[in-house]
Amino acid sequence: GLLNGSTSFAATITATGAVTHNLGTKDVIVQLYDVTTFDTVYADIDRTSVNAVTVTFGSTPTNSIRVLVQKIG
């Protein structure tokens, strides 16, 4: 869902996949964290379109991962 009007988006995922943010730009910062431990999680991020990113993990995460996307500029 939207966090702050049309500038931020958050979603929860459990594996590698696409996240549609509908922010209309590839100028976004993506941050990931484990919803159980609250530790920052690292993954490859591909800005596949102006409205989506793909998150690719090296291995499937143990817990759900919160994806925070923020529009820049």
Q: What is each model feature region?
A:
Residues 1-73:
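Extracellular attachment/recognition segments
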